[in-house]
């Protein structure tokens, strides 16, 4: 449809990605949602009218096919939300696993670079475009056991700033949203499916929700075209740093 604003979201099957799809649809975007877990995307498509496509950001062929499908259907992309990410393990470097570091860096760094490179022609085809990268407070902090993950999110910060320099002079805004503690599937994945250990992360805390971060994304992308929200840090009030959290302050009500 002519004039339709197209928002492309990676990692859209759950958490911040799914919440962003819902909120961006309500804000008037047509959402193209990509993820590996296509069964979950089906429900999202029915809920918000999104176009859903399989996507594995670590697979070059998958990324190329995803972008080609968006190009064939829409001809451009107004917004790219690089949300797909992971973090496996919380081990000190001395005990770290190669496979944990590999999947984290392949997804959070190489995957983000690959998707962005592949979508730049479609973003440049829009009158005004926007790239939103999901970073983390781990992109400017470190903590024991977090070497692989914090390295990946420091890289996201560097990539975001580099893109802003490289795209200067073009009508493409570049934003990083850096959340603190958000209650999603992240901790379950980090602890390899140990739900009890994941629950302990949020014990006694009112963490951020996926909708909180989606709300920030929608706010950033709906500013006037000449306004670029460079870098937004969002934490729950109980969290002063990655490793400094006050417990039992009460709920968010």
Model-predicted regions and their roles:
Residues 176-180, 184, 196-243, 247:
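C-terminal helical subdomain
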Residues 121, 165-168:
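Alpha-helical segment proximal to the catalytic Tyr-Lys
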Residues 91-93, 97-102:
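Substrate-binding pocket helix/loop in short-chain dehydrogenase/reductase
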Residues 55-65, 98:
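The beta1-alpha1 cofactor-binding region of Rossmann-like NAD(H)/NADP(H)-dependent oxidoreductases
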Residues 13-14:
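Conserved glycine-rich cofactor-binding loop
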Residues 136:
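Residue(s) in the substrate-gating loop at a strand-loop-helix junction
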Residues 116, 152:
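Active-site helix of classical SDR
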